[in-house]
Amino acid sequence: NSPFRTRSVAENLELFQKMKDGEFKEGEHILRAKIDMTSPNMLLRDPIMYRVLYKKHHRTGNDWNIYPMYDWTHGESDYIEQISHSLCSLEFKPHRDLYNWFRDHVYEYGKEQFPTPPKQREFSRLNLSYTIMSKRKLMRLVEDGVVSGWDDPRMPTISGLRRRGYTPASIKSFIETVGVSKRENIIDVALLEFKIREDLNKTAKRVMGVLDPVKVVITNYPEDKEEVLDASYNDYEDGFGSRDVPFSRELYIEKEDFREEANKKFFRLKLGKEVRLKNAYIIKAESCTKDANGHITEIQCTYDPLSKSGSGTEESTRKVKGTLHWVSIKHAVKAEVRAYDRLFSDEAPDSHKDKDFMEFLNPTSLEVINAFLEPSLQTATIGERFQFQRLGYFAVDRDTTSDTLVFNKTVGLRDSWTSHKNKR
């Protein structure tokens, strides 16, 4: 016990006033709550309520020479502000006994002015896989330059999620699905990604962009000809409207959408086979050109001029198994696309007692891609969200300028990470 535990109330009040008046040095005196030094809960063993601290406060300046400890001010401020329930994470459960002691022994004197006594309740933290939620550890990522700031799209912060393209509705739906638990667990981030896919599938306009291009030349399409195609922003829902998409002899498609030879399960473009170009024509791959290293640099195709989508001809309704997105090379808009992956390669990077969580950083969590987009996206505004058809959902980043479009990849159309993990 403290040798001063039996000091009288009057003497304690006198010393406390001197603490307030700045008559003592820091550490010379403290005010403690007289509870129970034999309590099995260490927090109830006469905890400190106030200490002398000569620090300038950002609001009150140097008006105060004493400052309260957390456990005292926690319940005190809740009571003054008439907070009915103080919701805390599970590590604060031992603090509830002290919270209640202060309420029962001190707040009794203010019940007429403040009639509602507060209650502390605990629940488990929201822990997401492949990231960390500790503010202290997130700050280390910022200070060490691992991420660009608190709003880096890889950060599990509201500002980071917003910049990446997550909507309030998707986050709310995720939280409602997870619910409140008393048990510590790790929520698979794939659930959060499912929620944003679900939301953007209903709300995002569909457009076309090519991230990894290979050139296609339609050899029987006139060199001096250009067309403007009317393309719907959403083929499945009304009210989205449409935009003009230019079409010409030379196009870009994705490299992975072409194979010289492929099995029957490959429904994209291959030599001697047909595919439909979205909102345009059916084309057939006739030949391809390679560079000195054997990489395909150009695909020569022919098109069926009667197969134009929506033209009403018999050929336009002809069924082919594959449909590809594309952009006209002549009209394509260059853009920077930032593709994001998991920030960490370990499901629970801060759960290893013998290792620093920084050891599990994913070196490929950010890939910057020089992409080619359809020209309608030139008028896209910061924060606007789109589905790049067959690729995923993307949002216009605040780094966009009048000269350069910048998109952040919000999420792919499918959970490719889980599929990859299951194959290992």
Show which residues each predicted segment covers:
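Active-site-adjacent structural elements in folded domains
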Residues: 155-161
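Short, flexible active-site loop motifs that bind/organize anionic cofactors or intermediates
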Residues: 85, 89, 161, 182
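Hydrophobic alpha-helix position signal
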Residues: 103-106, 141-145, 161, 175
